[in-house]
């Protein structure tokens, strides 16, 4: 019918719609429109042409034609019929019904013809008809959508294809790379040492060169034949602590402890100013800290010594010699000192007389059995140079390794259980005790390591992301399913779309489905995030949600909300459900308002901000509170979420023999966000009864109802509505393997990966839709007795619950719908997984987590013990260094000690990354134990105390510390006090052994004790000043005085000005109460005059409230013949005997004719010279023996691949 005429001129009708200045606009709204109906009617009326003469397409495409319905929608017409009508629209009519045939026809833009399907313009009808015939023809293989949409689909597929090229397509290569990196992260537990097991080197402190030999004949003979003495022959000899001097280790621990002899030239290397200096093993300044770190210094040094000695004693070759088996050394010096009793010298000197007492059967191997049942024996017992302190440390370390040992039968069971019975393994050889596989760890050790992991990662996303990427790489490497976006494109292409609405529903869908980055692994990252739900939170990124300013009529907003709703259950975000709900509530803010009780928040607040239980809308928490009549869609959505949100499942993984790191879950269990079913062993296929399928079906059903609702249908038009519902229905009908994969296959992959990752899974319980059960915090708190120095600290340390890691919803949505399919037509799950995961069990990376956990536990116990000995807080730990004066250590000092121990353990065991340093990064490291807990919204707290297991290295550290206390001279530490008094003599002088020297003490006659401040009281009239004693009375400086070292530290200036001159004059004697102190000794010739005054004055100048230098002592060099001596003046000597560090004097002579005379201590050599010695007896910790029997091991360390037989593996 002709249109109703309007009295409007065509030239006065505007072609551009200008919205009001305050109108809401959007970038997707096109404000430029075609000529209006009024302009078309005016043109038709002015030309006197009826509508039938214009053809079915009207005048070009500038005005509506008969294909437009009364509602404004485009009438759906088959393309073939529409093309035919379009082709015949310009044919001349056979009968012209208009009487005015010659009237002038005024056509709007008659020179341009436009295609109705794609919008292409043509200058003639012939070109338009040919275009329609070639580009829009119908056929079995043709597309039913417009070329613009086809182009969008192809562009979308191409983008995903480019991303797929970045994915690891060769699973074996990806797995091998991860396995190699995991093995590299394993600590260096085993270092073989074929050298001597000793840390003390008997060396010449003062050489005998220049002294007259008593007997020269045989000495010349030895020098001519280059015979090497087994014992030192210097004028003064000391056993020097030098770890590794006789080692022939396979790999260095890089923690050699090398203390120089306590002489003036070498004392600086054993006196430390800072903990860093202790750790590095060299001096920054020759200063000792009795008031701050006398406990810490020896403790840290003992840790360094024990870490250096963690070797496996290896057996060397045993050639036959003099009827006994001894080992052969390439180094002839080492061979000489290894068996000091093997050759007895003919010269009657001090060393020869001692070696003449050695027993022949105490040299070399004990017994001769080298083979057992045709195989090399597991161990060999032998006598050789070996100090029992080093031997004890190594035996304790060997016990630690043996406690971690797994026999082949256990390894086979572990491999089968960890692989979920998918890897068939068997033992190809019989049991033997010659192998050592330190791969196990106890559950308490793994739990403590897990807490340390939490401290190291905390809420640091950069530290947590590599964990997710590593697990995702493993899952991608073993899964048989791959993303295939073409499945989705085929479904989209089957839906016809002839709408001209901008944006097009199909075009907008393909635009939104384009990846924004490297998202091919998004679904695998989300699955991997389930393994670490206590450390990280996988949440949908904010840009995936619809714009809250949009309405429900916005097609992009509808698609975004649908995508978010589908992907939400795949994340570990506890607020994912309410965020997905609010993505729709934002769009329905105007037609369906609901109550948002949170202050400052409304229904238009972006959905991503609803990330706390207190802001959850009550209508979502309880859908029955929503009015079905006023909010039908939101009520239906909340009800659907509560009905179909997936219930979590449980997965068994690992094996109890390996231990379990679970803290909040039962041992060897994993929580899974979806219900689980057993893996089918024969075949796979799509499933339509799983929780995921029901979720997908219910989500699409809801959004179809949204599109059909009055809010949308009355606005977008019937054609657009049918296109939207058609697309949703087509996507819902896609036969995807994803539901089957998530329910039956993915749990197996998660269980296998969770059992082999270096970082064990750390999970918290999954909370569903109850806001009161949402976990808001995961915290680590120190445990231990309260201390005054820690009262101001917080009792807990809180950490944000999980590090946030965003993920794109697009690949999740694709994977959930249809972009995952099986790679083979006939897939056998057992065969596929057996082949895919076998590379994981060909190396020892399976046990890397256990080995790192053991080392972390050992480091924590050692660091805790060192710090506790500096802080008397009541923590029950052995304190062998209690006799050393010690002030309470501050938190910064404890942090330095913690870092020193952490660095030493990482250096000794070649560990990269964090170990125990996380304890000191977020608070005071002075802790006894650690506990971990999570806090729910309702206030409920679940706490787990992670007490460390027994520590072998801590026991070794305690033994070393006890030896330091009992034999401090070996570490240049003297016991007792120092007496400053003038002693002028021509005779011998031995300040370390004060026999015959005057000693006075507190309570003696005429002995005064200085007051607490060392105050000097000047006297008038030229009288000498006086000193206030401890009773507050002034006393004359002359006489005997007792000075506590603490008083001297604060009054050393007065001491140097008034007391020290009186001591040099011989009128005053002072006893400085030290307890223990470092010392150095200067050996000099007895022929020249000497005075100690300059050295003592320098020592006094170095005293400060923060430290005391080593006390300088002097002694003449022992002489072979009686010398002519000069007058010498000495001032300082000890009050106790401190010659324990002197090995001998004048070893090449019969005895010392003049000077200090020390013989070889026979109680250090009972295994060599005592017939009544029982093998295995030790005098530790009272005394260090230098010669002992030891057991050398012939272990083999098979690889996992070499231990087990796995079919199909070469």
Curated annotation (Swiss-Prot):
Gene3D superfamilies linked: Inner capsid protein lambda-1
One GO CC term on file: T=2 icosahedral viral capsid
Ranges for region Disordered: 1-28, 294-319
One Pfam match: Lamba1_VP3
Zinc finger (C2H2-type): 113-136
Subcellular localization, as worded in the UniProt entry: Virion
PROSITE patterns the UniProt entry points to: ZINC_FINGER_C2H2_1 (PS00028), ZINC_FINGER_C2H2_2 (PS50157)
Keywords attached to this entry: ATP-binding, Capsid protein, Helicase, Hydrolase, Inner capsid protein, Metal-binding, mRNA capping, mRNA processing, Nucleotide-binding, T=2 icosahedral capsid protein, Virion, Zinc, Zinc-finger
GO molecular function: ATP binding; hydrolase activity; RNA helicase activity; zinc ion binding
Domain of life: Viruses
Signal sequence annotation: none
Any single biological process term in GO: 7-methylguanosine mRNA capping
Low complexity composition bias: residue spans: 299-315
Chief location bin: virion
Subunit annotation: Homodecamer; each decamer is made up of two conformers of VP2, called VP2A and VP2B. 12 homodecamers assemble to form an icosahedral capsid. Interacts with VP6.
Homology family: Belongs to the turreted BTV-fold inner capsid family.
Biological role stated in the UniProt entry: Inner capsid protein that self-assembles to form an icosahedral capsid with a T=2 symmetry, which consists of 120 copies of VP2, with channels at each of its five-fold vertices. This capsid constitutes the innermost concentric layer of the viral mature particle.
The protein, known as: Inner capsid protein VP3
Source species taxonomy: Viruses, Riboviria, Orthornavirae, Duplornaviricota, Resentoviricetes
Gene name tied to this protein: S3
């Amino acid at each position: 019918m002709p249109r109703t005429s309007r009295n409007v001129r065509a030239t006065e009708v505007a072609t551009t719609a200008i919205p009001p200045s305050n109108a809401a606009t959007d970038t997707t709204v096109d404000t430029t429109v075609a000529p209006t109906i009024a302009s078309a009617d005016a043109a038709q009326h002015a030309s006197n042409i009826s509508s039938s003469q214009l053809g079915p397409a009207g005048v070009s495409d500038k005005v509506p034609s008969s294909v437009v319905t009364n509602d404004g929608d485009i009438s759906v017409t088959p393309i073939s019929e529409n093309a035919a009508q379009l082709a015949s629209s310009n044919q001349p009519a056979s009968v012209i019904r208009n009487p005015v045939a010659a009237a002038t026809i005024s056509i709007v833009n008659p020179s341009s013809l436009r295609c109705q399907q794609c919008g292409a313009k043509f200058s003639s009808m012939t070109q338009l008809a040919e275009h329609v015939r070639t580009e829009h023809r119908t056929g079995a293989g043709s597309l039913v959508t417009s070329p613009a949409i086809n182009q969008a689909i192809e562009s979308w597929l191409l983008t995903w294809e480019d991303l797929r090229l970045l994915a690891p397509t060769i699973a074996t290569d990806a797995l091998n790379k991860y396995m190699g990196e995991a093995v590299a992260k394993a600590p260096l537990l085993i270092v073989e040492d074929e050298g001597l097991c000793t840390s003390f080197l008997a060396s010449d402190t003062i050489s005998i060169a220049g002294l007259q030999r008593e007997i020269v004949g045989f000495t010349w003979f030895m020098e001519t034949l280059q015979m090497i003495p087994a014992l030192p022959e210097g004028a003064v000899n000391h056993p020097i602590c030098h770890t590794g001097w006789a080692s022939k280790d396979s790999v260095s621990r890089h923690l050699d402890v090398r203390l120089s002899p306590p002489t003036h030239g070498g004392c600086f290397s054993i006196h430390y100013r800072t903990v860093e200096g202790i750790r590095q093993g060299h001096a920054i300044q020759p200063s000792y800290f009795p008031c701050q770190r006398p406990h810490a210094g020896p403790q840290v040094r003992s840790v360094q010594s024990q870490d250096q000695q963690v070797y496996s004693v290896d057996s060397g070759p045993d050639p036959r010699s003099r009827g006994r088996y001894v080992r052969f050394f390439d180094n002839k010096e080492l061979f000489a000192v290894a068996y000091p009793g093997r050759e007895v010298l003919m010269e009657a000197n001090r060393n020869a007389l001692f070696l003449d007492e050695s027993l022949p059967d105490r040299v070399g191997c004990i017994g001769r059995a080298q083979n057992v049942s045709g195989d090399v024996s597991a161990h060999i017992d032998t006598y050789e140079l070996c100090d029992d302190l080093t031997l004890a440390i190594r035996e304790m370390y060997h016990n630690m390794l043996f406690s971690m040992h797994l026999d082949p039968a256990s390894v086979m069971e572990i491999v089968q259980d960890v692989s979920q019975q998918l890897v068939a393994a068997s033992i190809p050889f019989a049991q033997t005790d010659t192998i050592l596989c330190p791969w196990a760890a106890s559950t308490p050790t793994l739990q403590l390591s897990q807490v340390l992991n939490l401290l190291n990662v905390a809420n640091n996303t950069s530290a947590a992301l590599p964990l997710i990427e590593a697990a995702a790489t493993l899952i991608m490497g073993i899964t048989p399913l791959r993303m295939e976006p073409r499945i989705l494109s085929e479904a989209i292409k089957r839906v016809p779309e002839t709408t001209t609405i901008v944006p097009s529903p199909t075009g907008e869908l393909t635009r939104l489905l384009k990846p924004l980055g490297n998202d091919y692994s998004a679904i695998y990252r989300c699955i991997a995030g389930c393994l670490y739900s206590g450390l990280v939170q996988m949440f949908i990124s904010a840009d995936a949600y619809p714009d809250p300013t949009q309405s429900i009529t916005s097609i992009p907003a509808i698609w975004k909300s649908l995508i978010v709703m589908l992907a939400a259950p795949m994340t570990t975000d506890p607020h994912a459900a309410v965020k997905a709900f609010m993505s729709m509530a934002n769009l329905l803010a105007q037609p369906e308002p609901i109550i948002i009780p949170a202050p400052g928040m409304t229904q238009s607040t972006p959905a991503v901000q609803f990330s706390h239980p207190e802001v959850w809308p009550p209508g979502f928490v309880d859908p029955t509170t929503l009015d079905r009549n006023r909010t039908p869609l939101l009520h239906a959505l909340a009800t659907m979420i509560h009905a179909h949100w997936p219930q979590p499942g449980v997965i068994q993984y690992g094996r109890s023999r390996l231990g379990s790191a679970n803290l909040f879950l039962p041992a060897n269990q994993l929580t899974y966000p979806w219900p689980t079913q057993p893996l089918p062993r024969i075949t796979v296929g799509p499933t339509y009864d799983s929780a995921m399928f029901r979720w997908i079906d219910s989500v699409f059903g809801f959004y179809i109802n949204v599109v059909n609702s009055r809010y949308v249908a009355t606005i977008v038009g019937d054609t657009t509505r049918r296109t939207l519902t058609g697309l949703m229905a087509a996507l819902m009908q896609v036969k995807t393997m994803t539901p089957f994969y998530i329910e039956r296959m993915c749990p197996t992959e998660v269980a296998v990966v969770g059992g082999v990752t270096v970082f064990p899974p750390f999970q918290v319980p999954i909370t569903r839709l109850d806001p009161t059960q949402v976990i808001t915090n995961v915290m680590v708190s120190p445990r231990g007795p309260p201390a005054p120095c820690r009262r101001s600290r917080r009792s807990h340390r809180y950490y944000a619950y999980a590090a946030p890691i965003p993920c794109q919803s697009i690949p999740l949505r694709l994977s959930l719908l249809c972009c995952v399919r099986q790679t083979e037509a006939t897939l056998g799950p057992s065969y596929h997984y057996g082949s895919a995961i076998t590379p994981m069990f060909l190396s020892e990376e399976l046990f890397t987590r256990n080995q790192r956990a053991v080392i972390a536990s050992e480091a924590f116990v050692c660091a805790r013990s060192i710090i506790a000995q500096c802080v008397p807080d009541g923590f029950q730990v052995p304190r062998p260094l209690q006799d050393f004066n010690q002030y309470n250590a501050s938190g910064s000092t404890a942090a330095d000690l913690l870092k020193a121990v952490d660095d030493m353990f990482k250096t000794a065991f070649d560990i990269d990354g964090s170990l125990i340093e996380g304890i000191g990064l977020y608070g005071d490291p002075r802790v006894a134990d650690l506990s971990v807990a999570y806090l729910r919204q309702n206030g409920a707290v679940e706490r787990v105390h992670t007490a460390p297991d027994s520590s072998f290295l801590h026991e070794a550290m305690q033994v070393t510390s006890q030896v330091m206390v009992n034999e401090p001279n070996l570490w240049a530490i003297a016991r007792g006090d120092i007496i400053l008094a003038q002693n002028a003599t021509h005779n011998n002088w031995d300040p370390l052994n004060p026999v015959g020297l005057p000693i006075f003490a507190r309570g003696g006659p005429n002995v005064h004790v200085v007051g607490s401040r060392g105050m000097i009281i000047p006297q008038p009239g030229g009288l000498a000043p006086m000193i206030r004693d401890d009773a507050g009375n002034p006393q004359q400086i002359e006489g005997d005085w007792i000075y506590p070292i603490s008083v001297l530290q604060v009054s050393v200036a007065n001491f140097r000005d008034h007391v020290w001159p009186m001591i040099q004059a011989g009128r005053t004697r002072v006893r400085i109460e030290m307890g223990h102190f470092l010392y150095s000794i200067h050996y000099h010739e007895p022929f020249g005059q000497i005075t100690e005054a300059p050295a003592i004055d320098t020592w006094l100048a170095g005293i400060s409230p923060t430290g005391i230098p080593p006390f300088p002592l002097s002694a003449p060099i022992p002489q072979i013949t009686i010398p002519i001596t000069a007058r010498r003046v000495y001032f300082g000597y000890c009050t106790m005997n401190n010659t324990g560090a002197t090995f001998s004097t004048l070893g090449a002579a019969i005895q010392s004719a003049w000077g200090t005379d020390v013989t070889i201590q026979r109680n250090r050599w009972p295994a060599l010279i005592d017939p009544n010695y029982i093998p295995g007896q030790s005098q530790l910790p009272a005394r260090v023996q230098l010669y002992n029997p030891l057991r050398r091991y012939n272990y083999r360390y098979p690889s996992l691949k070499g231990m087990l037989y796995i079919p199909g593996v070469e």
